[in-house]
Amino acid sequence: MIRAPLRAALLAALMAAAWTPLGLPTPAYAQLPSLGDGGGLTLGAERRLGERIARELYRDPSYIDDPVLSDYIQSLWDPLLAAARQRGDLGAELEERFAWRILLSRDRSVNAFAVPGGWLGLHLGLLAVTQSRDEVASVLAHELSHITQRHISRMVAQDSRQTPWVVGAMILGAIAASRSPDAANALITGGQALAVQNQLNFSRDMEREADRVGFGVLSQAGFEPLGFVTMFEKLQQAARLNDTGAYPYLRTHPLTTERISDMRARVPIGPTTAAPADVLHAVMAARARVLSAGGVDTLPDDRNRLL
């Protein structure tokens, strides 16, 4: 389960955010925004909220600073950022104000989550189950799109009176899912109980929007679009065969046949083939599996062995 000190610190940070001026709209503005509306938290307010959460994530014992894996993930992240910029999804002000950093966790569960202000959490367990760089990039593109489309801010704009609890439940639920599915369910359920019914529908719309925008970013960045589909299918199959809580990503990003079909329909028509064997990715996935095991703190840099 999520460690008590971390949980307490996160709750304290979120409660502090509730009482700190964050540039929230007045209750009269508490209406469901259009999908193009980023109203809610200002850029600066969202960055400050994210910094509070990120500080605690950096302090958590599961946080890992492995230069080899960090460099590899960054090599996938940078082209996605460039593609989002070229497409107009990432404006100059948003790029300047947000952090755009990825935090790695040695957690063995399959999970990734966006944090306010441009941080993204990635579990080594997710990297370990992927078979290609394109599959990893598809997850990063999806989460990046949650950030560029200001989904957290728009959740806030939906009902500003419930902001601290809804945002807190969403963030803590995503993080707690990596430790205890039961705890995550309680947090998410609590957040939903505080929200209006429209918020659940809006969340589904957010997932579809992150799929569509993320798919475009993935393709623009030069990755194989089919990676989006194969990653979705991998997660869906895992959910059917294994409901032990090892795939918390599915709890916060529920897959539907509609979403998978939509992504497959976007893949360019023509013969499709599996991604060619990628030795570097295979090494990185293996490294992630080893480092996510208990008792292993560091590994030598084995990239030169591939040269």
Predicted regions and their residues:
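Membrane-active amphipathic alpha-helices enriched in small hydrophobic residues
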Residues: P164-R179, A186-A195
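Catalytic Zn2+-binding segment of zinc metalloproteases
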Residues: D134, L144-R161, R179
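Extracytoplasmic and endomembrane cell-envelope/extracellular-matrix remodeling and assembly machinery
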Residues: G36-G40, E51, Y63, D71, ...
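Solvent-exposed coil/turn segments that connect beta secondary-structure elements
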Residues: D78-P79, S105-S109, G117-W119, G125-L127, ...
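Active-site His/Glu-centered metal-binding helix of metallohydrolases
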Residues: I53, L140-I152, V213
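Short pre-active-site segment immediately N-terminal to the catalytic Zn-binding motif
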Residues: G121-S138
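Hydrophobic or amphipathic, alpha-helical segments that drive membrane association/targeting
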Residues: I2-A4, A13-F113, A195-V196, A238-R240
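Acidic/histidine metal-binding catalytic segments
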Residues: V156-G168, A183-L187, G222-F232
